[in-house]
A protein has these predicted regions:
Chain A
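Short S/T/G/P-rich N-terminal loop/turn motif that feeds into the first structured element of a domain
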Residues: 1-157, 177-193
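Outer-membrane beta-barrel domain signature
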Residues: 158-167, 171-172, 176
């Protein structure tokens, strides 16, 4: 089933919490945490392909995607009071399909090596808007922020293996350097409630 | 802290090995040093400059652990000259690879942060 995520950037001075409370029917509507990179002020997520975002003068920019999962898993279904992380990325046009599949396969192997990833899902985008024509959404859940900022970043499987797809200095580079790296707190698991 | 090696394996077009290495040292190495990379060694294989067959250059840099690696990576992302060098060098290259490695005794430390 299709999913929808929007990373919403608000005008300076807008009340993020108030905006999140009034956004209507969503699975998740949470202010982002410090440290996001082009990740917006709010993450809005729905488990259905309802891409409607209420029109509001407080909105400055939206990066969003409707997407179909191609893989995922759960080490801790029903996780509560954790951290949800979403990466929107755009594989460069013309990348051979076999290369894209290898990139997807290696990305989906990250939880095998990085234990702090408790639940995860990789998806291909069917409809994108924002700064790039996003092609993939890579979502993970962690028990706490330390799992993302610590082992996810420091494990060699990330930086010495998967990152070469993202690194313009590596000949395997296929992912546009403009990414949306966003994360927020949640009460109930988004990926495996 | 644990040493991490950044290894560039460059296969030069026949007759271009010496010029490729000179360009790497003149146009890439200064920026790499500024990004925290410490040159460990340069190897030329086979150890003569050939004009009708490819030389392979292996250039090994060190950084300090995952933090040093990310420091290098983020600095390179903000430095257009890093990717500009590779675009220019392409004319002298048959192929290249960039690998990241560590001593076997450091693997567990790197994996467990």
């Amino acid at each position: 089933m299709a999913k929808f995520t929007a990373l919403i950037t608000l005008q300076p001075g807008a009340d993020r919490a108030a905006f999140a409370r009034n956004i209507g029917d969503t699975t998740l509507a949470q202010p982002t945490l410090p440290g996001v990179f082009d990740g917006g002020d709010l993450i809005l997520h729905r488990q259905v392909a309802n891409e409607a975002v209420p029109s509001d003068a407080a909105i400055a920019h939206i990066d969003s995607a409707v997407y179909e999962p191609i893989g995922g898993g759960a080490h801790e279904p029903g996780l509560r009071n954790g951290v949800y992380r979403c990466l929107l990325l755009a594989v460069k046009p013309g990348t051979p399909e076999a290369t894209v599949r290898q990139f997807e396969s290696e990305t989906l192997a990250m939880p095998h090596y990085i234990g702090t990833i408790r639940n995860w899902r990789l998806s291909r985008v069917t409809k994108a808007s924002g700064a790039r024509v996003w092609t993939h959404v890579w979502e993970q859940e962690y028990a706490d922020i330390g799992g993302l900022l610590g082992p996810y970043m420091t494990n060699p499987y990330h930086w010495a293996r998967v990152d070469r797809w993202f690194d313009p200095e590596c000949p395997e580079w296929i992912v546009d350097t403009r990414l949306c790296h966003s994360f927020c707190a949640f009460e109930r698991s988004v990926l495996n409630p | 802290m644990t040493a991490v090696q950044i290894i560039d394996d460059l296969v030069a077009r026949p007759g271009e090995g010496k010029a490729l290495l000179d360009a790497y040292m003149a146009d890439y190495a200064p920026g790499a040093r500024a990004r925290g990379m410490v040159l460990d060694r340069v190897l030329v294989s086979p150890p003569l400059w050939m004009d009708d067959q490819p030389n392979t250059l292996t250039i090994v840099w060190n950084v300090e652990g995952a933090a040093g690696w990310w420091g290098m990576r983020l600095a390179a992302g903000a430095d257009p000259s890093a990717t500009a060098f590779w675009e220019t060098a392409g004319a002298r290259l048959v192929s290249r690879a960039r690998r990241f490695a560590a001593a076997p005794e450091d693997v567990e430390t790197l994996c467990n942060g």
